């Protein structure tokens, strides 16, 4: 509310912006910049098209889905420290019986990364420190549990043998919420960072 940040909060937000800045030309919004630029269109039109792509729940909107899914989990699981209860919820999630009934554990899986998303690994180390500072270690522990169990359950149910890992979206929304950034600003913050990459392309 007073618009001031602790040194750790500033470092975490800075890291978030850096991690979202660029990620190759294969992601949806960066690919969109290639397509629109190839027609000879101007920079403003290219950025507008990239923003439209980023808005989708499978791209820039994924952080919001993770946060909403975790809220739903807390609402529907009596004891979030009970791994059996969390596992049962995640199974119901994949069976399209919970949350938005899409059969997805949001923030899990990536088109390229199977062992780990290096951006998520960097983010996770800062997330723990911030959670400790903000008195949200319990929430961080729940995210850890969902990460661990989610990998197992997806691999078992979907027969994914190459492995599955959390992506950068998994912890991003949690970090933004600890920084008191509203959900409505999650995707615009992503865009602020990613415009650097779009411009480079």
Show the residue positions of the predicted features.
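Non-transmembrane, aqueous-exposed alpha-helical and coiled segments at domain scale
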Residues: 1-201
């Amino acid at each position: 509310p007073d618009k001031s940040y602790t040194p750790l909060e500033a470092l975490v937000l800075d890291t978030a912006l850096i991690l979202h800045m660029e990620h190759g030309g294969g992601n949806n919004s960066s690919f969109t910049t290639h397509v629109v630029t190839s027609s000879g269109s101007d920079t403003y039109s290219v950025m507008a098209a990239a923003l439209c792509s980023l808005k989708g729940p499978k791209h820039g909107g994924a952080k919001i889905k993770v946060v909403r899914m975790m809220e739903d989990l807390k609402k529907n699981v009596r004891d979030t420290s009970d791994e059996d209860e969390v596992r049962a919820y995640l199974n119901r999630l994949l069976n399209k019986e919970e949350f938005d009934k899409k059969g997805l554990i949001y923030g899990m899986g990536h088109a390229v990364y199977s062992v780990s998303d290096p951006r998520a690994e960097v983010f996770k180390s800062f997330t723990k420190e911030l959670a400790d500072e903000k008195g949200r270690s319990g929430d961080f522990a729940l995210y850890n549990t969902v990460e661990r169990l989610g990998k197992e359950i997806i691999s078992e149910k979907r027969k994914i043998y190459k492995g599955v890992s959390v992506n950068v979206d998994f912890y991003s929304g949690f970090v933004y919420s600890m920084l008191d950034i509203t959900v409505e600003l999650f995707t615009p913050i992503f865009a602020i960072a990613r415009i650097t990459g779009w411009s480079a392309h």
